[in-house]
Each structure stands twice: as structure tokens, then as C-alpha cells.
Amino acid sequence: MLRRARPTTFAIFLVAALATASVCLGAEPKAKKLKPVPLPLLPATQEWIATLDDAPSAGGAMDAERVYVPLQSERIVALRRADGSRVWTRDIESKWPPVVIGDAVYIVASDEMHALDAATGTERWRVPFEHQLTAPLAATTSLATGGTERSLVAVADKGLVIAVAAADGRTIWMRELGALSRFTPALDDVRTFVALDDGRMVALRLMDGRVEWDQKLEGKLNQPSVSRDRVFVGTNTNLLYAFDNSSGRLAWRWKAGGDVIGTSADAKGGAYYASLDNVLRAVNRGNGNQRWIKEIPTRPLLAPLTLGDGVKYEEIVVLTGATSEIDAFAAKNGASVGMYQPPPGGDLEGPPLIDGDLKPYQVAMVVITRDGRVIGLKPSAMLLPEPALLPLPPELPGRRLERERVTPPATR
């Protein structure tokens, strides 16, 4: 007697048969999506080293083609980024790092400001600048909201903040704040944020220099930074403050174990700050909740730098130490992902110059040493290793063949 199959059992067999048939008909399983790896900036391999005619007078600047370095012999030199060869030299003295905007290089001398063509070094404009800078120049990365031109922002003696038009050197506005600043201003598309020696954090509108907010904090302030809707500044009282960038409202603050020397942030809501207790911390940008904490191998010298887009590569945090060691950490969990130590005697002059858009076989990082060396570095992971040259064996494998002797035909 035949038994009737249950509908559930029949459905199971039908699904299995269809799945088998689809495989037989050539259907391919879905490929697994590869997870991005941390940006492979470090470790790095030295591509070239150039010896300057004199020691550098300040840190340098870099664009896609060249590296620009001011010298103590009152000159500025441009080197080719690919191989370190000299491109041009100009007789301009400066004790401040140059700034690059597009195809122009900007230098502040003792009493003038210069704009040079980046490719040739020829002068584009030159204007008197009677103020003494107290910190390196800052440059807008785009047109300010409501503005019509790119600008440079300088902090000078007497507590002056000055905005200069990048196109022609014209002074757009000046604002006196009543106290010196010793740190490069932080900029977004609307405002510039200045940390003052009297403990104030001030936001000025980029378009006209109007004061938008002013916050008084405890202790001496360090290098400010901005990311989306947050402005960060650390102090020598071991505190990190985060403010709303538009209103100046205190969003949160964190207590560290040492002076907080600087902060950077990524595109996914993370913020990273280093303190003089030899610790790097990651927190949520919005509310300050801690994500991870990492002891670092050397005392931090400069503010951290975050690189990576979070899509092609995961973000990394790059930190330069007092021993000139450069370390990279995964922004996701703080794991160490690489380091670079300059050659002996190679104390760094200024921060490393880094291009986060890595390309195979191309120099991505340049360091300048105080003894007058410039070193171009390629990420080791972006190089295909060449096969090692091996000596030929005395006997080749296989059976030796006897030479065939050909007897010429007899001639008549």
C-alpha cells in the first residue's frame, strides 16, 4: 500500500532538487567580501635620500610631485618626490614651514609673504608682512561658506589673527584677540579656531573674522583640531575638551594621565588623542565614551594623525615620538601595525610628510632630519618583492644527451 508523502517533506525535497539543479546549471556561489585591512603605510622602505646644502630652518611641505624645504642659509629648495632630485631653489629666508595650495607654495619671511609657482619656483606675488608669526600658517581646504576665495590664516604677535587671500596676498581681515597663540589654527569650512596663551579657545568666522564664540578653560592649551561638529583642545591640566563647533557649547571632557598634546578624528565617529603619560586613547567623537586605550613605546612629540578612508583601507593613527620613532596603530582597536625609525642621528625637523592615498611603488612618506637629510619612503606592502638571484647548479637536472654527429653525404 502506497503512503502519501506529507506536504512538508515534499517541499523540502523540492527545494533541495532546485538547489542542486541550479548548481548543475552553472550557478556560482557568492564570493565572500574581503574585509579592508589597516592602511599599509608602515613599515616603509627607503627609496631615496637627499643631502641638503644646509640644515633645514623648519619643517617642510609636500604635494603630489615635490617636497619643499626652507634652509638656514636663507633659501627654499624643491625636490622631486619620486627620486629626491633638486627641481629649483629660491633665495627666501623663513623659519616657518611652507604651505601648499593647489599649484602654489606660500612662504612667510621676516617681513614679507611670498607665493611661488610650485613647479618652477617663479614668483606669483610678494607682499609686505610686518607682523611676526607666532605659529605656522594654516590654509583653507576649500572655499569658506559664504566666501569666494581660498585663504591663508596667520597668528602673529599682539594677538593678531590675519586672513590673507591666496590669489594675490591681499589682507581680507584682521582680528586682535588680546593674547598670543603658539599653535596653528584649526579650520573647517566656516570658522577658524584659535587656542590662546591666556587659556581661551576662540572661534572666528572665516568670511569676515567675526568672533562667534569664546570659551575660557583651565591651564595652558595645546594644538586644537576640528572634525565635523566637534572642536578638540587639550591642556596641561591633563584634560581634553570637546566643543560644539558652531555654538561653543561644551560637549564633553576627558581626564588623562598627562598633558594632552593633540587630537585627530576619523570619518566613522572616532577621535584619538595622545598624552604625556605615554598613552594613546580612542573615544567616540560625539559623546567621549572610551573605545580603547594603548600604551605607546615612546613619549609622544606631535599630535596624532588619522589616515585612511574606512572603505578601501581601515583607518590608522600615526604618532611621532620624542625619539623620532613613527608608529602606526589600527584605529579600530589600537593594535600596532607598523613603525619607522630614521637612520642614526636623524632627529626629525617637523612632522613626517604623508600622502594617505597610497599607490604601488610610489613614495608616500618623506621625513626631514635636522642634520640636513631628506628621506623618501615607500610602503613595504605596496612593493612586489623581486625574486632572489640564485647561482646556477653545477649540474642541471635531467639526463645528459650525447651530441648527435651528422655525416655529410658523399659527393660524386
What do these predicted regions represent?
Residues A11-S22:
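Bacterial N-terminal signal peptides
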Residues A31-D54:
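A short helix->beta-strand "capping" segment at the edge of beta-propeller domains
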Residues K378-L389:
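Short loop/turn segments immediately following beta-strands, especially the blade-tip
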Residues R80-D83, D117-T120, A165-D168, R205-D208, ...:
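Short loop/turn segments that connect beta-strands within beta-propeller blades
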Residues T45-A50, S85-R90, T122-V127, R170-R175, ...:
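A short beta-strand motif characteristic of beta-propeller blades
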Residues D53-R75, R90-H114, V127-I162, R175-V202, ...:
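Repeat-blade elements of multi-bladed beta-propeller folds
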Residues M1-F13:
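Bacterial N-terminal signal peptides that target proteins for export
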Residues C24-P29:
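Boundary at the C-terminal end of the N-terminal hydrophobic targeting segment
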